[in-house]
Amino acid sequence: MTDRVRKPEWLKINIGANERYTETKRIVDSHCLHTICSSGRCPNMGECWGKGTATFMIGGDICTRSCKFCNTQTGRPHPLDANEPTHVAESIALMKLDHAVITSVDRDDLPDLGAEHWAHTIREIKRLNPQTTIEVLIPDFQGKMELVDLVIDARPDIISHNMETVRRISPLVRSAANYDTSLQVIRHISKKGVKSKSGIMVGLGETPEEVETLMDDLLATGCQILTIGQYLQPSHRHYPVVAYITPLQFTKYKTVGLEKGFNIVESAPLVRSSYHAEKHIR
């Protein structure tokens, strides 16, 4: 099955825009910022922007990697914008966010892979928004833990790193990323005493048994929060959808994950990494 096959009813969404959506878009555009909501064609953008929330993407909008599931543009990135951390922090203040989520493209072209830019952004958000909690969804930094430490030392409240898929499928869809390296990054975050989180997509051909094995692998790292959502093929050039997972199976995954020991499991067809993230800080 490919994503050109008609989607099931449970995947149909309403993108309707309201005044809050329009204002969120105005703030993002006026500060020349990027969001994973738009670059990743997130199905929840209408809902989240309509509530005045967005996931900011730093480091530009061009990624040095070319994962087969991701819609973000790939190629040679532009130099970092030194004003971006302040612009992100100012936008968060204008949006009056209680909880901010930040992610980034991979910047394998930079000596520090973008780690100091990450840390600077977190510090600027804290400076202008001292009451706002911060969640960051970071790349693997090529498994260089001293770079992960730069992010940890800036003291975000939650650090997330996505496994994306089960071990068998990981090399088929992840560019320059490694299943075990990702586990090591999450383990390092957990050992530092930071609340850790990860997310996966299903519908890529994995089995329920493989998903449960991935859960066990994550729990062994100390990961506390897991998100599970349906993979949707961004274009014909991307990896095809193998199956549309039923809402019942998503419910089963949530039940199994909680029984195994995760503190929080968000599992539904339209769940994405930052969906309802404000609830995860509690």
Residue locations for each model-derived region?
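Auxiliary Fe-S-binding modules of radical SAM enzymes
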Residues: 1-55, 86, 90, 96, ...
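Local cysteine-cluster metal-coordination motifs and their immediate loop/turn environment
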Residues: 36-48, 61-74
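A secondary-structure boundary/capping signal
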Residues: 38, 59, 103, 137, ...
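Short connector loops/turns at beta-strand edges and beta->alpha or beta->beta junctions
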Residues: 61-64, 97, 164-166, 231-233
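Core AdoMet radical
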Residues: 72-87, 94-145, 152-184, 197, ...
